[in-house]
Amino acid sequence: MIRVACVGITVMDRIYYVEGLPTESGKYVARNYTEVGGGPAATAAVAAARLGAQVDFIGRVGDDDTGNSLLAELESWGVNTRYTKRYNQAKSSQSAIMVDTKGERIIINYPSPDLLPDAEWLEEIDFSQWDVVLADVRWHDGAKKAFTLARQAGVMTVLDGDITPQDISELVALSDHAAFSEPGLARLTGVKEMASALKQAQTLTNGHVYVTQGSAGCDWLENGGRQHQPAFKVDVVDTTGAGDVFHGALAVALATSGDLAESVRFASGVAALKCTRPGGRAGIPDCDQTRSFLSLFV
Protein backbone atom coordinates (compact mmCIF):
# COMPACT_ATOMS: atom_id res chain seq x y z
CA MET A 1 0.00 0.00 0.00
CA ILE A 2 1.32 3.44 -0.97
CA ARG A 3 1.86 5.74 2.02
CA VAL A 4 1.15 9.43 1.48
CA ALA A 5 1.43 12.54 3.63
CA CYS A 6 -0.46 15.68 2.56
CA VAL A 7 0.77 18.91 4.14
CA GLY A 8 -1.16 22.18 4.00
CA ILE A 9 -4.52 23.69 4.73
CA THR A 10 -7.99 22.39 5.38
CA VAL A 11 -10.96 24.76 5.14
CA MET A 12 -14.72 24.55 5.37
CA ASP A 13 -16.20 25.15 1.92
CA ARG A 14 -19.63 26.78 2.02
CA ILE A 15 -20.85 26.23 -1.52
CA TYR A 16 -23.69 28.20 -3.14
CA TYR A 17 -25.05 26.92 -6.46
CA VAL A 18 -26.28 29.84 -8.59
CA GLU A 19 -27.63 30.28 -12.12
CA GLY A 20 -24.78 32.57 -13.11
CA LEU A 21 -21.69 33.94 -11.41
CA PRO A 22 -22.13 37.55 -10.20
CA THR A 23 -20.78 40.27 -12.47
CA GLU A 24 -21.92 43.27 -10.44
CA SER A 25 -23.05 44.23 -6.94
CA GLY A 26 -26.51 43.21 -5.77
CA LYS A 27 -28.45 40.37 -4.17
CA TYR A 28 -28.39 36.85 -5.58
CA VAL A 29 -30.40 33.73 -4.76
CA ALA A 30 -28.79 30.29 -4.62
CA ARG A 31 -30.67 27.28 -5.99
CA ASN A 32 -28.78 24.92 -3.66
CA TYR A 33 -26.28 25.03 -0.82
CA THR A 34 -23.90 22.61 0.88
CA GLU A 35 -21.03 22.59 3.35
CA VAL A 36 -18.07 20.28 2.85
CA GLY A 37 -14.43 20.18 3.86
CA GLY A 38 -12.01 21.64 1.34
CA GLY A 39 -8.48 22.95 1.01
CA PRO A 40 -5.84 21.81 -1.49
CA ALA A 41 -3.83 19.40 0.67
CA ALA A 42 -6.86 18.10 2.56
CA THR A 43 -8.84 17.31 -0.58
CA ALA A 44 -5.75 15.77 -2.16
CA ALA A 45 -5.54 13.57 0.93
CA VAL A 46 -9.12 12.39 0.44
CA ALA A 47 -8.40 11.63 -3.21
CA ALA A 48 -5.33 9.59 -2.27
CA ALA A 49 -7.32 7.66 0.33
CA ARG A 50 -10.10 6.97 -2.18
CA LEU A 51 -7.46 5.52 -4.48
CA GLY A 52 -6.35 3.06 -1.83
CA ALA A 53 -3.39 4.84 -0.26
CA GLN A 54 -2.65 5.04 3.45
CA VAL A 55 -2.86 8.78 4.08
CA ASP A 56 -1.95 11.27 6.80
CA PHE A 57 -3.02 14.91 6.72
CA ILE A 58 -0.60 17.34 8.36
CA GLY A 59 -2.04 20.78 8.97
CA ARG A 60 -3.61 23.22 11.42
CA VAL A 61 -7.15 23.89 12.64
CA GLY A 62 -8.78 25.87 15.42
CA ASP A 63 -10.53 24.36 18.41
CA ASP A 64 -13.92 25.52 17.11
CA ASP A 65 -16.87 23.57 15.72
CA THR A 66 -15.55 24.10 12.20
CA GLY A 67 -12.25 22.49 13.15
CA ASN A 68 -14.09 19.56 14.72
CA SER A 69 -16.11 19.06 11.54
CA LEU A 70 -13.08 19.32 9.26
CA LEU A 71 -11.15 16.64 11.13
CA ALA A 72 -14.18 14.38 11.52
CA GLU A 73 -14.86 14.53 7.79
CA LEU A 74 -11.25 13.72 6.90
CA GLU A 75 -11.33 10.74 9.25
CA SER A 76 -14.62 9.59 7.69
CA TRP A 77 -12.84 9.42 4.32
CA GLY A 78 -10.07 7.28 5.81
CA VAL A 79 -7.52 10.08 6.26
CA ASN A 80 -5.53 9.99 9.51
CA THR A 81 -5.34 13.38 11.26
CA ARG A 82 -2.99 12.41 14.10
CA TYR A 83 -0.40 14.97 12.96
CA THR A 84 -2.82 17.90 12.67
CA LYS A 85 -2.20 20.68 15.20
CA ARG A 86 -5.13 22.32 17.00
CA TYR A 87 -4.79 25.89 18.25
CA ASN A 88 -6.64 26.98 21.38
CA GLN A 89 -9.23 29.75 21.10
CA ALA A 90 -8.66 29.87 17.35
CA LYS A 91 -10.94 30.06 14.33
CA SER A 92 -10.50 27.53 11.55
CA SER A 93 -10.24 28.63 7.92
CA GLN A 94 -13.23 28.68 5.58
CA SER A 95 -14.27 29.62 2.05
CA ALA A 96 -17.42 30.87 0.35
CA ILE A 97 -17.80 29.35 -3.11
CA MET A 98 -20.29 30.17 -5.85
CA VAL A 99 -20.80 27.57 -8.59
CA ASP A 100 -22.78 28.25 -11.76
CA THR A 101 -24.75 25.83 -13.96
CA LYS A 102 -21.64 25.13 -16.08
CA GLY A 103 -19.65 24.07 -13.03
CA GLU A 104 -17.43 27.15 -13.02
CA ARG A 105 -16.81 28.86 -9.70
CA ILE A 106 -15.69 31.87 -7.69
CA ILE A 107 -13.87 31.21 -4.40
CA ILE A 108 -13.47 33.66 -1.52
CA ASN A 109 -11.06 32.19 1.03
CA TYR A 110 -10.64 33.28 4.65
CA PRO A 111 -7.26 31.98 5.88
CA SER A 112 -7.59 32.22 9.64
CA PRO A 113 -4.83 34.40 11.15
CA ASP A 114 -5.25 32.42 14.37
CA LEU A 115 -3.41 29.46 12.82
CA LEU A 116 0.24 30.35 13.31
CA PRO A 117 2.59 29.73 10.36
CA ASP A 118 5.38 28.22 12.47
CA ALA A 119 6.28 24.71 11.29
CA GLU A 120 9.16 23.77 13.57
CA TRP A 121 6.90 21.24 15.28
CA LEU A 122 7.11 19.11 12.12
CA GLU A 123 10.64 18.20 13.24
CA GLU A 124 8.99 15.79 15.68
CA ILE A 125 7.50 13.75 12.81
CA ASP A 126 9.36 10.89 11.11
CA PHE A 127 8.96 11.62 7.40
CA SER A 128 10.68 8.40 6.36
CA GLN A 129 7.41 6.55 7.01
CA TRP A 130 5.89 7.81 3.73
CA ASP A 131 6.52 7.02 0.07
CA VAL A 132 5.54 10.50 -1.07
CA VAL A 133 4.89 13.86 0.59
CA LEU A 134 2.52 16.30 -1.12
CA ALA A 135 2.25 19.92 -0.01
CA ASP A 136 0.19 22.91 -1.05
CA VAL A 137 1.53 26.47 -1.06
CA ARG A 138 -1.03 27.91 1.35
CA TRP A 139 1.11 27.00 4.38
CA HIS A 140 4.49 28.02 3.03
CA ASP A 141 6.52 27.31 6.16
CA GLY A 142 4.90 23.91 6.52
CA ALA A 143 5.62 22.95 2.91
CA LYS A 144 9.25 24.09 3.18
CA LYS A 145 9.88 22.19 6.41
CA ALA A 146 8.04 19.06 5.23
CA PHE A 147 9.89 18.95 1.91
CA THR A 148 13.24 19.51 3.61
CA LEU A 149 12.60 16.64 6.02
CA ALA A 150 11.21 14.41 3.27
CA ARG A 151 14.23 14.93 1.03
CA GLN A 152 16.56 14.20 3.93
CA ALA A 153 14.69 10.89 4.30
CA GLY A 154 14.84 10.14 0.56
CA VAL A 155 11.08 10.56 0.12
CA MET A 156 9.48 11.87 -3.10
CA THR A 157 8.01 15.40 -2.92
CA VAL A 158 5.05 16.70 -4.94
CA LEU A 159 4.07 20.39 -4.91
CA ASP A 160 0.59 21.75 -5.61
CA GLY A 161 1.73 25.02 -7.15
CA ASP A 162 -1.42 27.11 -7.06
CA ILE A 163 -1.44 30.89 -6.97
CA THR A 164 -0.31 32.58 -3.75
CA PRO A 165 1.06 36.05 -2.89
CA GLN A 166 4.34 34.53 -1.68
CA ASP A 167 7.32 33.62 -3.85
CA ILE A 168 7.33 29.82 -3.99
CA SER A 169 10.68 29.45 -5.76
CA GLU A 170 12.26 27.71 -2.77
CA LEU A 171 9.38 25.22 -2.64
CA VAL A 172 9.77 24.47 -6.34
CA ALA A 173 13.48 23.85 -5.79
CA LEU A 174 12.62 21.28 -3.11
CA SER A 175 10.10 19.49 -5.36
CA ASP A 176 10.64 16.28 -7.28
CA HIS A 177 7.37 17.10 -9.05
CA ALA A 178 5.85 20.60 -9.17
CA ALA A 179 2.37 20.73 -10.69
CA PHE A 180 1.14 24.28 -11.21
CA SER A 181 -2.21 25.83 -12.00
CA GLU A 182 -2.09 28.37 -14.84
CA PRO A 183 -2.40 31.34 -12.44
CA GLY A 184 0.19 29.80 -10.12
CA LEU A 185 2.71 29.31 -12.92
CA ALA A 186 2.15 32.81 -14.29
CA ARG A 187 2.56 34.31 -10.81
CA LEU A 188 5.79 32.39 -10.22
CA THR A 189 7.46 33.16 -13.55
CA GLY A 190 5.89 36.45 -14.61
CA VAL A 191 5.24 34.80 -18.00
CA LYS A 192 1.69 34.45 -19.32
CA GLU A 193 2.42 32.10 -22.24
CA MET A 194 2.32 28.67 -20.64
CA ALA A 195 4.96 26.90 -22.76
CA SER A 196 7.53 29.58 -21.99
CA ALA A 197 6.46 29.77 -18.35
CA LEU A 198 6.91 26.02 -17.96
CA LYS A 199 10.46 26.24 -19.32
CA GLN A 200 11.16 29.11 -16.93
CA ALA A 201 9.88 27.06 -13.98
CA GLN A 202 12.15 24.18 -15.00
CA THR A 203 15.19 26.37 -14.33
CA LEU A 204 14.21 26.46 -10.65
CA THR A 205 14.28 22.71 -10.03
CA ASN A 206 15.96 19.47 -10.98
CA GLY A 207 12.54 17.83 -10.72
CA HIS A 208 9.66 17.65 -13.19
CA VAL A 209 7.26 20.54 -13.84
CA TYR A 210 3.63 20.38 -14.96
CA VAL A 211 0.81 22.86 -15.57
CA THR A 212 -2.88 21.98 -15.37
CA GLN A 213 -5.14 23.99 -17.68
CA GLY A 214 -8.67 22.81 -16.94
CA SER A 215 -10.47 21.84 -20.13
CA ALA A 216 -7.22 22.36 -22.08
CA GLY A 217 -5.58 19.44 -20.28
CA CYS A 218 -2.14 19.16 -18.70
CA ASP A 219 1.33 19.91 -20.08
CA TRP A 220 4.68 18.86 -18.63
CA LEU A 221 8.33 18.73 -19.61
CA GLU A 222 10.06 15.39 -20.08
CA ASN A 223 13.33 14.47 -21.80
CA GLY A 224 13.74 18.04 -22.95
CA GLY A 225 10.35 18.19 -24.67
CA ARG A 226 6.86 19.42 -23.90
CA GLN A 227 4.27 16.67 -23.41
CA HIS A 228 0.48 17.00 -23.40
CA GLN A 229 -2.44 15.10 -21.90
CA PRO A 230 -5.84 16.25 -23.24
CA ALA A 231 -8.65 16.71 -20.75
CA PHE A 232 -11.31 13.99 -20.77
CA LYS A 233 -14.72 15.20 -21.89
CA VAL A 234 -17.40 14.71 -19.23
CA ASP A 235 -20.69 16.34 -18.26
CA VAL A 236 -19.35 18.90 -15.78
CA VAL A 237 -21.45 19.60 -12.70
CA ASP A 238 -18.90 21.20 -10.36
CA THR A 239 -15.17 21.87 -10.83
CA THR A 240 -14.59 22.64 -7.15
CA GLY A 241 -11.56 20.72 -5.93
CA ALA A 242 -10.67 19.30 -9.35
CA GLY A 243 -7.10 20.55 -9.20
CA ASP A 244 -6.67 19.29 -5.64
CA VAL A 245 -7.96 15.87 -6.64
CA PHE A 246 -5.59 15.84 -9.62
CA HIS A 247 -2.62 16.45 -7.33
CA GLY A 248 -3.62 13.73 -4.88
CA ALA A 249 -4.07 11.24 -7.70
CA LEU A 250 -0.81 12.31 -9.33
CA ALA A 251 1.09 11.70 -6.08
CA VAL A 252 -0.37 8.20 -5.76
CA ALA A 253 0.30 7.35 -9.41
CA LEU A 254 3.88 8.63 -9.34
CA ALA A 255 4.62 6.66 -6.18
CA THR A 256 3.06 3.57 -7.78
CA SER A 257 4.52 3.55 -11.29
CA GLY A 258 6.86 6.50 -11.70
CA ASP A 259 5.89 6.83 -15.37
CA LEU A 260 5.02 10.47 -16.00
CA ALA A 261 2.63 10.08 -18.96
CA GLU A 262 0.79 7.20 -17.30
CA SER A 263 0.56 9.12 -14.02
CA VAL A 264 -0.75 12.31 -15.64
CA ARG A 265 -3.35 10.35 -17.62
CA PHE A 266 -4.51 8.57 -14.48
CA ALA A 267 -4.72 11.79 -12.46
CA SER A 268 -6.59 13.51 -15.30
CA GLY A 269 -9.15 10.71 -15.32
CA VAL A 270 -9.67 10.94 -11.57
CA ALA A 271 -10.13 14.72 -11.75
CA ALA A 272 -12.55 14.46 -14.68
CA LEU A 273 -14.78 11.99 -12.85
CA LYS A 274 -14.79 14.22 -9.77
CA CYS A 275 -16.29 17.03 -11.86
CA THR A 276 -19.38 14.95 -12.66
CA ARG A 277 -20.80 15.38 -9.14
CA PRO A 278 -21.29 18.42 -6.89
CA GLY A 279 -18.86 19.28 -4.11
CA GLY A 280 -15.12 18.92 -3.90
CA ARG A 281 -15.04 15.32 -2.65
CA ALA A 282 -18.29 13.42 -3.26
CA GLY A 283 -17.41 12.61 -6.85
CA ILE A 284 -13.86 11.36 -6.26
CA PRO A 285 -13.66 7.87 -7.82
CA ASP A 286 -11.74 4.86 -6.57
CA CYS A 287 -9.12 2.99 -8.64
CA ASP A 288 -11.57 0.55 -10.21
CA GLN A 289 -13.93 3.33 -11.31
CA THR A 290 -11.01 5.29 -12.73
CA ARG A 291 -9.60 2.35 -14.68
CA SER A 292 -13.06 1.56 -16.05
CA PHE A 293 -13.43 5.18 -17.16
CA LEU A 294 -9.97 5.29 -18.75
CA SER A 295 -10.66 2.06 -20.65
CA LEU A 296 -13.25 4.00 -22.66
CA PHE A 297 -10.48 6.16 -24.12
CA VAL A 298 -7.96 3.53 -25.22
Swiss-Prot record:
Pfam families (UniProt xref): PfkB (PF00294)
Modulation of this protein's activity: Strongly inhibited by ADP. Activated by sulfoquinovose (SQ), sulfolactaldehyde (SLA) and dihydroxyacetone phosphate (DHAP) (through effects on KM) and by fructose 6-phosphate (F6P), fructose bisphosphate (FBP), phosphoenolpyruvate (PEP) and citrate (through effects on kcat/KM).
EC number: 2.7.1.184
Gene Ontology molecular function: 6-deoxy-6-sulfofructose kinase activity; ATP binding; kinase activity
GO biological process, one term: carbohydrate phosphorylation
SUPFAM superfamilies assigned: Ribokinase-like
Inducers of expression: Induced during growth with sulfoquinovose.
Positions with a binding annotation for ATP: T212, G214, G217, G243
Phenotypic consequence of gene deletion: Mutant fails to grow on sulfoquinovose as a sole carbon source.
Catalytic activity: 6-deoxy-6-sulfo-D-fructose + ATP = 6-deoxy-6-sulfo-D-fructose 1-phosphate + ADP + H(+)
Residues of the signal peptide: none
Quaternary structure (record): Homodimer.
Name of this chain's protein: Sulfofructose kinase
Organism listed in the record: Escherichia coli (strain K12)
GN (gene name): yihV
